[in-house]
Amino acid sequence: MTSASAPSFNPGKGPGSAVGIALLGFGTVGTEVMRLMTEYGDELAHRIGGPLEVRGIAVSDISKPREGVAPELLTEDAFALIEREDVDIVVEVIGGIEYPREVVLAALKAGKSVVTANKALVAAHSAELADAAEAANVDLYFEAAVAGAIPVVGPLRRSLAGDQIQSVMGIVNGTTNFILDAMDSTGADYADSLAEATRLGYAEADPTADVEGHDAASKAAILASIAFHTRVTADDVYCEGISNISAADIEAAQQAGHTIKLLAICEKFTNKEGKSAISARVHPTLLPVSHPLASVNKSFNAIFVEAEAAGRLMFYGNGAGGAPTASAVLGDVVGAARNKVHGGRAPGESTYANLPIADFGETTTRYHLDMDVEDRVGVLAELASLFSEQGISLRTIRQEERDDDARLIVVTHSALESDLSRTVELLKAKPVVKAINSVIRLERD
């Protein structure tokens, strides 16, 4: 928990009181938030105990036409808007990091509760934002920052607060899931599948943040922080994208009864000192087709949680898009508004555990290696001996003969990442190994 002393109880404005909203950003998500608040205003007022009233909308260009919005609501001065006394809740859907950080901190320090959908902001500055919210005795909500419409932050913070979470693993990026699903279902290569995702609007003009795993890493940091009560930033998350996944990798996975997904994996484990530690990583992963996450297709997202008492749980749905994200944002607005009307405050950041964050080399998992090797007697024995010398046990070896060499697909038992990395470097130095085409990690069903 934060070190600040416990703030005084917020008694609330009282039933029937209006709750003033400042909306920062009016793009796809902001427009949908405004539409939902307008369309369902009466219903929301009953659920909250008082009406939501939009006091202003901060935009970058006030001259741009915006259908259905009163011009007097628009402003280019976000800081002046959040300082208004009739604003109770600030909704940040701008995007980016540094400017939103300044605005959100200013809002919290001004005594406004904040709802944000900005995963990059939360992953990079959660500690600073949480401390500011605690000091001002206001709420900081960010359900939409992780998986769009899928409720997972709330369940981890509240519903599973009495349990011991062992792992959180999920498909948290719709763009990469669409691409991998297209490769799996059509046999297309990565470039063609990315082009199709771009054509359909699932991928940005610059897809780097998605396909290289950075977006998923931000979300993994948030999930790990909540699940394990330890501050984790995106810099703590090992990150590897999907741009090197080939059609041959997909075909090999299918032949083995697996599928490839880009997963965010957060785990608590016992390290070599015998103490609890956590790891957070994002990378392409082979999943057995029997695993619940293997059936998550197209641009859908899902988060798979394992807890000591509750067992296995999965949260599934739309992880992106204007309306799904706006749904999660508005859910947070309702929660913050209830506290403004009736008093109280939502649970804040809980980082009492302060567990060490393991180096990626301490990760233990299974591996799938695809190699081109010389096709002659003794090669298999030579390579098997190398794996054994490095302390890595082999689960299966499959060889495909070709005209001038052989394709070797090796699956290991569980091994340390550091041991596997060292072994790969030794394999590259072997004259009998012509190429290492891919190294992909495996998860159990």
UniProtKB/Swiss-Prot annotation:
<feature type="binding site">
    <location>
        <position position="321"/>
    </location>
    <ligand>
        <name>NADPH</name>
    </ligand>
</feature>
<feature type="binding site">
    <location>
        <position position="29"/>
    </location>
    <ligand>
        <name>NAD(+)</name>
    </ligand>
</feature>
<feature type="binding site">
    <location>
        <position position="28"/>
    </location>
    <ligand>
        <name>NADPH</name>
    </ligand>
</feature>
<feature type="binding site">
    <location>
        <position position="58"/>
    </location>
    <ligand>
        <name>NAD(+)</name>
    </ligand>
</feature>
<feature type="binding site">
    <location>
        <position position="204"/>
    </location>
    <ligand>
        <name>NADP(+)</name>
    </ligand>
</feature>
<feature type="binding site">
    <location>
        <position position="146"/>
    </location>
    <ligand>
        <name>Na(+)</name>
    </ligand>
</feature>
<keyword id="KW-0486">Methionine biosynthesis</keyword>
<dbReference type="InterPro" id="IPR005106">
    <property type="entry name" value="Asp/hSer_DH_NAD-bd"/>
</dbReference>
<feature type="binding site">
    <location>
        <position position="119"/>
    </location>
    <ligand>
        <name>NADP(+)</name>
    </ligand>
</feature>
<keyword id="KW-0479">Metal-binding</keyword>
<comment type="pathway">
    <text>Amino-acid biosynthesis; L-methionine biosynthesis via de novo pathway; L-homoserine from L-aspartate: step 3/3.</text>
</comment>
<feature type="binding site">
    <location>
        <position position="321"/>
    </location>
    <ligand>
        <name>NADP(+)</name>
    </ligand>
</feature>
<dbReference type="Pfam" id="PF03447">
    <property type="entry name" value="NAD_binding_3"/>
</dbReference>
<feature type="binding site">
    <location>
        <position position="201"/>
    </location>
    <ligand>
        <name>NADP(+)</name>
    </ligand>
</feature>
<feature type="binding site">
    <location>
        <position position="150"/>
    </location>
    <ligand>
        <name>Na(+)</name>
    </ligand>
</feature>
<keyword id="KW-0028">Amino-acid biosynthesis</keyword>
<feature type="binding site">
    <location>
        <position position="26"/>
    </location>
    <ligand>
        <name>NADPH</name>
    </ligand>
</feature>
<comment type="similarity">
    <text>Belongs to the homoserine dehydrogenase family.</text>
</comment>
<keyword id="KW-0791">Threonine biosynthesis</keyword>
<comment type="pathway">
    <text>Amino-acid biosynthesis; L-threonine biosynthesis; L-threonine from L-aspartate: step 3/5.</text>
</comment>
<dbReference type="GO" id="GO:0050661">
    <property type="term" value="F:NADP binding"/>
</dbReference>
<keyword id="KW-0560">Oxidoreductase</keyword>
<comment type="function">
    <text>Catalyzes the conversion of L-aspartate-beta-semialdehyde (L-Asa) to L-homoserine (L-Hse), the third step in the biosynthesis of threonine and methionine from aspartate.</text>
</comment>
<protein>
    <recommendedName>
        <fullName>Homoserine dehydrogenase</fullName>
        <ecNumber>1.1.1.3</ecNumber>
    </recommendedName>
</protein>
<feature type="binding site">
    <location>
        <position position="143"/>
    </location>
    <ligand>
        <name>Na(+)</name>
    </ligand>
</feature>
<keyword id="KW-0915">Sodium</keyword>
<keyword id="KW-0521">NADP</keyword>
<dbReference type="GO" id="GO:0009086">
    <property type="term" value="P:methionine biosynthetic process"/>
</dbReference>
<feature type="binding site">
    <location>
        <position position="215"/>
    </location>
    <ligand>
        <name>L-homoserine</name>
    </ligand>
</feature>
<feature type="domain" description="ACT">
    <location>
        <begin position="368"/>
        <end position="445"/>
    </location>
</feature>
<dbReference type="Pfam" id="PF00742">
    <property type="entry name" value="Homoserine_dh"/>
</dbReference>
<dbReference type="InterPro" id="IPR036291">
    <property type="entry name" value="NAD(P)-bd_dom_sf"/>
</dbReference>
<dbReference type="GO" id="GO:0009088">
    <property type="term" value="P:threonine biosynthetic process"/>
</dbReference>
<dbReference type="InterPro" id="IPR002912">
    <property type="entry name" value="ACT_dom"/>
</dbReference>
<dbReference type="Pfam" id="PF01842">
    <property type="entry name" value="ACT"/>
</dbReference>
<dbReference type="InterPro" id="IPR016204">
    <property type="entry name" value="HDH"/>
</dbReference>
<feature type="binding site">
    <location>
        <position position="148"/>
    </location>
    <ligand>
        <name>Na(+)</name>
    </ligand>
</feature>
<feature type="binding site">
    <location>
        <position position="321"/>
    </location>
    <ligand>
        <name>NAD(+)</name>
    </ligand>
</feature>
<dbReference type="InterPro" id="IPR045865">
    <property type="entry name" value="ACT-like_dom_sf"/>
</dbReference>
<dbReference type="InterPro" id="IPR001342">
    <property type="entry name" value="HDH_cat"/>
</dbReference>
<dbReference type="GO" id="GO:0070403">
    <property type="term" value="F:NAD+ binding"/>
</dbReference>
<dbReference type="InterPro" id="IPR019811">
    <property type="entry name" value="HDH_CS"/>
</dbReference>
